[in-house]
Amino acid sequence: MTNVPWLTAIVLFPVSAGLLIPLLPGRGNHIVRWYALGICLLDLILMTYVFGCYYNLSDLPVQLKEDYCWIEILDFHWRLGVDGLSIGLILLTGFVTTLATLAAWPVTRNPKLFYFLMLAMYSGQLGLFASQDILLFFVMWELELIPVYLLLSMWGGRRRLYAATKFILYTAGGSIFLLAGLLTASLWGSNAPVLDFEILSHKSYPLGLEILIYLGFLIAYAVKLPAFPLHTWLPDTHGEAHYSTCMLLAGILLKMGGYGFIRVNMELLPHAHTVFAPWLVALGAYQIVYAALVSFAQRNLKRRIAYSSVSHMGFVLVGAGSLSDLGLSGAMLQMISHGLIGASLFFLAGTSYDRTRTLMLREMGAWASQMPKMFAMFTTCAMASLALPGMSGFVSELMVFFGMVTSAAYSPYFRAIITLIEAVGIILTPIYLLSMVRQMFYGSRISSVSVFNNIDAGPREVFVLGSLLLPMIGIGIYPNFALPLWSAKTQAVASLVQPTSILYSQTLYNIQ
């Protein structure tokens, strides 16, 4: 036990240090980028030290609790804590943000504002994953949008304003449902708002009301995940954003939707979850195949990778809807795995653009001989994305696959149909990924497009990709590097929905 407010320090340190950026000397980006990288690295070291020394993997309850009254009249507390659902995502946030800051080295336009926004986004994401108060969760959910919008609208492609506006409209629209859901959940059956996650988890609601609350939360999280049909902001956003911003979007922001769905919908509203679970499984399976087909039709490199993200996040829906411990644990691992893989692919897409000034696949070709290191790294990351054995994606998708197959909540016919659809999606994944690699690095050279900067990957790029590949391979070879972080918690959450799920499987959803 410790009385030191470690989590408050971890959450507030990046944005607090970022406020000092305007005081840094010089107009160039040399000092500010080293300063921002140092802040991210120090925060990553701090969280690693704190979790290593003070977090006990075998303890199920929330640990490192902090509770400070913020707005007394609303009973609004600065309430932080860490458990199995959040610790892995907090570490992922620190790791990916540090590498994204290093990836943003070439940014030269208004670097002070750029790096401050990255640090502010960093604090917002850490605060969301560490929140143990549902109103604080909402505040962090909203505050994190501001730096994302500015990063999208000020640094990116020609249609960046359109993409940023579409992003903010989708997410703000989803936030309305999130706010309505949390107000209803916190005020129901009490004279004062109940905002503590731990207390809310013991509240009960009439089933009809619980379903309405669940639906409001589901819409908000489906936008961020993203889930079909609320996914259309993602390809536009990734297509226009700077690749360091894309690393943060794919690596962390999408995981906010999956985390909120498991933390709130499953843990606080288990009865409603059993009602929606079959539909979530069906939606996730459809999304895996649909996004894979649409990805194959994309001719823009970043849009193809964006749709691959939509496809891979479908496994999170299937795992959460499987109502099994194995499936839910696989969904958690899928979020970690995709955070690493998505960040690596968008980084490679951006560094390729820096050299060629094109993202159109039809204008690429025969780059393998010119950039052999880039070719090797791109191919390796594509293999990780298509769930090659020995990579983290293989383990996570296999866990979701078997979690659905072995789920006692559904009939054999329903499980067989979903498994078949998932298998089709798994087969489609190498088709669009390997064709992408072929168009970029094989074939004939397009005469109208040449490599402007005919320099292969440098030490900085090799370091960023190597750092992302190490945990992908490590988890793929030995999954217990990551699984113990959340295994006890996912078992507890799955146990909340399994008893009632058996009843529902025998009545409403027993498809014969």
UniProtKB/Swiss-Prot annotation:
A GO-annotated cellular component: chloroplast thylakoid membrane
UniProt keyword Transit peptide present: no
Protein's recorded name: NAD(P)H-quinone oxidoreductase chain 4, chloroplastic
BP terms from Gene Ontology: ATP synthesis coupled electron transport; electron transport coupled proton transport
Membrane topology of the entry: Multi-pass membrane protein
Assigned keywords, A-Z: Chloroplast, Membrane, NAD, NADP, Plastid, Plastoquinone, Quinone, Thylakoid, Translocase, Transmembrane, Transmembrane helix
Principal subcellular localization: plastid
Entries under PANTHER family matching the protein: NAD(P)H-QUINONE OXIDOREDUCTASE CHAIN 4, CHLOROPLASTIC (PTHR43507:SF21), NADH-UBIQUINONE OXIDOREDUCTASE CHAIN 4 (PTHR43507)
Enzymatic reactions: a plastoquinone + NADH + (n+1) H(+)(in) = a plastoquinol + NAD(+) + n H(+)(out); a plastoquinone + NADPH + (n+1) H(+)(in) = a plastoquinol + NADP(+) + n H(+)(out)
InterPro entries associated with the record: NADH_Q_OxRdtase_chain4, NADH_Q_OxRdtase_chainM/4, NADH_UbQ_OxRdtase, ND/Mrp_TM
EC numbers for this chain: 7.1.1.-
Taxonomic placement: Eukaryota, Viridiplantae, Streptophyta, Zygnematophyceae, Zygnematophycidae
